[in-house]
């Protein structure tokens, strides 16, 4: 039995998220269906980060086991031929049998993209959140400092979150402006359900001047979801990278835009 790693890109608009669901199409379902056909046996995959409905990925990492004798090209080109246009395998390699894309991961990186312009863009409408009001990046980054380290993020977790603990360790949280785009990059060991989108929603209130940077600290300490702002829309969020002890994978979405 061999263990294979896949690097996946997908556009999440047409899916209920990564995880297989009985009521709607999912990225996992499409990938397992294509892999199973190439392997001529049932294939089940594990991913580094289970993205929500409408969320995208430029570098999702997946692993699966198979005893099917296939060249690496079959696992990439062959499977890609069976996948829909909004899901594709970028790379494939054989890895140690102990490797697990989820549990071996040290940290995960997400980008949230904001198109900050007076006029909306028909081209980018489905790829980023449009905000026509000017955002104060400096104040947003001041607020981000309160997010760093291991903390209780109860104020930013969904009511449907099934995690056993609200504690997460954030190593980086930063807004970067590139032309009309503002990129929120966040790196952490893991994230709660809707956590990043809830953070973005609250940080936008700071950037628009409705709240001070210190307000984020107050919300964190409240440990109460009702104290934070509304959840930012899903279509601006991208899973862009994973770090493992032996290697890392990262494809920043803004570099694909610019």
Swiss-Prot record:
Keywords recorded for this protein, A-Z: Isomerase, tRNA processing
Role: Formation of pseudouridine at positions 38, 39 and 40 in the anticodon stem and loop of transfer RNAs.
Name of this protein: tRNA pseudouridine synthase A
Enzyme Commission number(s): 5.4.99.12
MF annotations from Gene Ontology: RNA binding; tRNA pseudouridine(38-40) synthase activity
Family membership: Belongs to the tRNA pseudouridine synthase TruA family.
Matches recorded under PANTHER family: PSEUDOURIDYLATE SYNTHASE (PTHR11142), TRNA PSEUDOURIDINE SYNTHASE-LIKE 1 (PTHR11142:SF0)
Residues involved in substrate binding: 110
Listed InterPro entries: PsdUridine_synth_cat_dom_sf, PsdUridine_synth_TruA, PsdUridine_synth_TruA_a/b_dom, PsdUridine_synth_TruA_C, TruA/RsuA/RluB/E/F_N
Residues annotated as the enzyme's active site: 52 (nucleophile)
Annotated catalysed reactions: uridine(38/39/40) in tRNA = pseudouridine(38/39/40) in tRNA
CDD domains on file: PseudoU_synth_EcTruA
GO biological process: tRNA pseudouridine synthesis
Quaternary structure (record): Homodimer.
């Amino acid at each position: 039995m061999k263990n294979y790693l896949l690097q996946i890109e997908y556009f999440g608009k047409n899916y209920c998220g990564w995880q297989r669901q009985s009521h709607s199409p999912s990225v996992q379902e499409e990938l397992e269906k294509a892999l199973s056909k190439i392997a001529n046996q049932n294939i089940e995959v594990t991913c580094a980060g289970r993205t929500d409905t409408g969320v995208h990925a430029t570098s999702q990492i997946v692993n699966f086991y198979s005893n099917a004798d296939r060249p690496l090209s079959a696992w990439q080109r062959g499977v890609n031929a069976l996948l829909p246009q909004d899901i594709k395998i970028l790379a494939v390699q054989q890895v140690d049998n102990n490797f697990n894309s989820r549990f071996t991961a040290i940290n995960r990186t997400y980008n949230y993209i904001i198109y900050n312009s007076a006029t909306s863009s028909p081209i980018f409408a489905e790829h980023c959140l449009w905000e026509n009001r000017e955002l104060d990046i400096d104040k947003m980054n001041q607020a981000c400092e309160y997010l760093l380290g291991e903390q209780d993020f109860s104020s930013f977790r969904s009511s449907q979150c099934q995690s056993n603990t609200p504690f997460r360790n954030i190593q980086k949280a930063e807004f970067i402006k590139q032309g009309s785009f503002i990129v929120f990059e966040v790196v952490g060991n893991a994230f709660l359900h809707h956590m990043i989108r809830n953070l973005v929603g609250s940080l936008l209130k700071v950037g628009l001047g409705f709240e001070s940077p210190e307000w984020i600290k107050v919300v964190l300490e409240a440990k109460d979801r009702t104290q934070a702002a509304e959840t930012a829309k899903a279509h601006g969020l991208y899973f862009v990278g994973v770090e493992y002890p032996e290697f890392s994978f990262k494809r920043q979405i803004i570099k694909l835009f610019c």
